[in-house]
Amino acid sequence: VETFVMLGLFAGLRAGEALALRWQDVNFDQRFLTIAPRHDWTTKTRRTRVVPLNDELFAYLKRRRESNPETERVIEVSYEGMKKRFQRLVKLAGLPTAGEEKVTAHALRHTFASHLVMAGTPLYTVAALLGHGNTETTRLYSHLAPSHLQEAVNGLKYGG
C-alpha cells in the first residue's frame, strides 16, 4: 500500500496507472515516470505522459527497486487486492469509509493536484502532470487558489 500511496501523492497517478507501472517505466537516470498505453493496458486518455520524480519519490522508488530487483511491476498486487488494502488503511486511520465523505484511492491524486494548485502551479502544468486532455477538468481545483489570485493582482502598480 505504501508504494501505491506514494505514487498517488507525489506523482498524481490514477489507481490503474500505479498498478500497471513497470520498472521499465521508471527512468532513474533522468528522474521521471513514463505513463503509456500498452497492449495489455491503456491510460484513461490513451496518451503517453511523462511525470517528473521529486526527491522524496525518487529516493523511495530507488530503495524499493534495490529491495525488489526481480519484480517486473512496481506494485505486485491486483486492483481488487489494492482496493481492499487501501480501504483497510483508511479505516485504521479513522477516515470515512462510506457515504459522501468516503476516502478512496482517488483522494491521493486529488491531494496531489490540490497541493500543486495551492502552491501556485499554473493549471495547464497541473493538467499536463495529471494527464488531463484539457484544463477544463483541472479547473475543478482552481477554487483552491484564491489567495494566489489576490497576491497576483496586489503586485500591480500603475503610475505613481
What are these regions (language model features)?
Residues F4, G8, V90, L116-V117:
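Short helix-to-turn junction characteristic of helix-turn-helix DNA-binding domains
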Residues R49-P52, R63, A119, H143-G160:
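DNA/chromatin major-groove-contacting recognition/catalytic segments
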Residues N54-E100:
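Active-site/catalytic core of tyrosine-dependent DNA strand-transfer enzymes
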Residues E80-M82, A98-G120:
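Short basic/aromatic active-site micro-motif
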